[in-house]
Amino acid sequence: LLFIAALGLTVAVGADQKLKRPNILYIIVDDQSPFDFKFYNQRSQLDAPVIEKLAAEGMVIDGAYQMGAWVGGVCTASRHMIMSGRTVWHIPDRPFRKPPANPNALNPKLVPPDLVRNTLAAVFNRAGYDTMRTCKRGNSYDDANKQFTVVHDATKRGGTAETGSAWHAERVLDYLGEREKAKDEDPFLIYFGFSHPHDVRDGTPELLEKYGAVNHRDKDTLPPANSKQPNLPINWLPEHPFHHGHPGLRDAVKVPGVWERRDERTIRNEIGRQFACSEYIDQQIGRVLAKLKAMGELDNTYIVYTADHGMAIGRHGLQGKQNLYEHTWRVPFVVKGPGIKPGSRAQGNVYLLDTLATLCGLAGIKPPTTNEGLSLKPVLMGRAQTIRDTLFGVYCGGTKPGMRSVRRGDWKLIKYDVMDGTVRKTQLFNLKENPNEFIREHHGLRKFVKPNRNALNLADNPKFADKRKEMEELLLKEMRRLNDPHRLWDQPKN
């Protein structure tokens, strides 16, 4: 009898443990710089109380990056990396593009033909999780998205509940309501994606009014000035000092409300629109978190907040996401959940491609053998500050070989080899002393406090010649390690 009782106790405990497997709510927005938020940028005027509360109750990662892209739609490469856990040169392209924008995409030694079987939802399905997603359509890893058991995708960038971000929240709320009604106790992975604040940034009338912005449609006029509009970014420029390397790029010339303008009125209005869309997203996240709390699931749920890449909107005289400055290469990254110390911060040095390994680690699932990412769990649990010491970035969606970046510690190198060799530039920044990556052109502006005289591109300063050489050698090493098919003008061809 004692043996039977003990056996029954073991079974009961085992079942209870199974019920307590953590849920995951992965929130991802489209086109958002980390510097939109006060917890990354004290100058920001965005109100995002729900996300700010997540940051206060969880961990903020100061060094979260997306590795880059080989196509103008940066989100395509970014979302392939998120879903697969693989590096930028080891992922497929969308099937319609022939030849693929990634020259390695059809090489089975670098991109496994059956990769989709080992993408995020497929892995969690096999582990007994219920999987659901809502997000925008297009510029994504379509076959991986289909692995989610429940899929509600649509592009919603309007200013009403039906045409905007509330639509995505409703899909999640409906899903949670159905689980509650069915008394479904399986753990869940919800990929809670938004179409905003990617343009067209049509906010709700109330939030547009709050930020002094209008949905400007007339290409021949400037939007009205309004004192409520957010201030210009501290590293705003009226134009970038040299060509970014992608002629005719949509984000540089065709975004409604901005087009090719970088003047103060246009940029402040567009940031107001960005903030209106972002605060509306914040409200929708709050609705979902309230539902989880009412269901008794909130404390057993890991919540991740991030974006598929950053965004310029006037910073350095740029508009889109096709650059490697920190405002665009970096992404916001906040995690709250069991075992994470409230109000904590860490450098992290995490890529978005580490999502698969990280979520597997938090859920106690073994990552697939195709995964190349690292788990952020040691950092989230307070056992480490970073998971790697070197970060690599690429953009070559325009002229080749494009831009490359590498960061280690406080030092960052960016190299440009674009426009068929007519633009070849090197930038070297000490991010501790120059976190806004000020360049010479910033020193002549009167909009802001004049930058420190040493807050410059140091690439041509003889005092830093050794550091430049060191970083260039590190960049080449990373390009080789990651199977980058291109080489810059001053690199060996192998």
Q: What annotation goes with each model-predicted range?
A:
Residues Y40-S44, V60-R86, R94-P95, R133-A144, ...:
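Short, solvent-exposed turn/loop segments enriched in Gly/Ser/Thr/Pro and often Arg
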